[in-house]
Amino acid sequence: MRSFHDCLPRDGAAKIISLISHITLLNEEKEPNALSLIKDAAFAIIAGDCMGAYKLYHDCARRLLLSPARRVSGDMFMDHLIWLAVEREHAFAKSSARGELDEALLMSFRSDLAALGELASLDWHDIYRMCAERYRELQAKSRYARDDISVMSSAAWTGTEPRPKPQQKDVPLPGDAAAPLPPPSESEWLSWSYGEKEPRGEYAADEVLEEIYIRLMESPDWRGMAEDLFNLFASSGSGIFLKTRLLKCAGGTLGLAAARHEAVALSVQDNAKQALGERIIAFMRGSRPLPVLIHGPKAIGKTELALSMADEFPELRAVIIEPMAGADVHRLFARLCAQPLRFMLLIENADAYSPLWSPLLCACTGGGLPDNVLPVATGTSASGMEEFVVKIAMDKLELDGFVNTVKELVEAQAPYLQADMGWIRNASVDYQLDAHDELNIPAAKLIAQRYMAEHE
């Protein structure tokens, strides 16, 4: 087929309408969306409503700017098409993540990929060109409209019978109030292009995604990517699970968790880290998940320890969870169970005696726990948590351990500084006497910050 870059305006607009109307599985359910607005703009071009097409184009551009699509290709429209096929959690992605190859979905997925691949050759300048050329066509038609005398003259010249002129609506002449308005100049159309071809940000599945992105951007036919995308979903999950290793479930809704600073390996946590690591390794190898409880004084680094361990296993995702109703817990379990990944369910500050926590804790220790979910709870006490059969104790920090922790924090954050152990010990003693507070990880971070500020 002729590309969008050199086709006639009506032909190009008709092709846009045909391709978008053809998309079934990968189109967004809610309208108006980016594709439906571009389709409406194409209808407006055919009708000669250039200003209407201009408005619809910018409505689409607004959707593209606010789209959840990752910035990858340097073109907002291409990014949106890639998002529809790869990052959006559509029916084919969900079934593939479960390891199911549904032939009907695969057939529809291939067909939609073919349409998206053709649409990927469309750029913003094509829409502008179609509008401008369509306007010129209508202007020429109105300028050279044939009257009855010209029809009879043509017939006499060619020696044929004059054909009756078809009935048609009067074409407005230039300057008439009903005449089509010219499209704005090219500089007034918001460009879809924004930069270089490179993925912005970091995704959990980037090792596989980057090759997928390159092939989609370079290939004119996306149908051949169906099997590769099936393998992506079947190994790395779908939707939000491609994006991050750290999630949060609040109110029954699973979403991205706030970014956390990379944890520093602390020697005071070595024993707890080894014990938790052994359980996670066994879990990753397919052993039955045994609920884990990490207990100890407040602010001793229990949550940071668990999250740091999750970072060490590429196929492990951490889900920070809040108290929720039993029905919400089972919906969460069903969603996690439908993914090919393994999950650490992090339950912070669990309270076995609170009715708010009861549905979640019961679900984590009952028979409905999925095989790919490992509950890890943190708390100040092991009382009432008998069902969490693996218990890891973390002791409170004594002065020597606290001083060493401050030293390790300084060395990790400012390796160019030499830690003055005398200064650190004196500051630690002063803090303990002045604040009358426990020596804990936040206090160690505070003193480390003071040391770096004074010695830099």
Positions of PLM-derived features:
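AAA+ P-loop ATPase mechanoenzymes
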Residues: 2-267, 271, 428, 434
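Pre-Walker A (pre-P-loop) alpha-helix and adjacent loop at the N terminus of AAA/AAA+ ATPase modules
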Residues: 258-292
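AAA+/P-loop NTPase substrate/partner-engagement loops
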Residues: 270, 312-341, 353
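Walker A/P-loop nucleotide-binding motif
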Residues: 286-306
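A conserved segment at the C-terminal end of the G1
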Residues: 307-311
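Conserved nucleotide-binding/hydrolysis micro-motifs of P-loop NTPases
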Residues: 325-327, 351-353, 380-384, 396-402
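Conserved catalytic/switch belt of AAA+ P-loop NTPases
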Residues: 333-338, 346, 351-384
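C-terminal alpha-helical "lid" subdomain
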Residues: 386-456
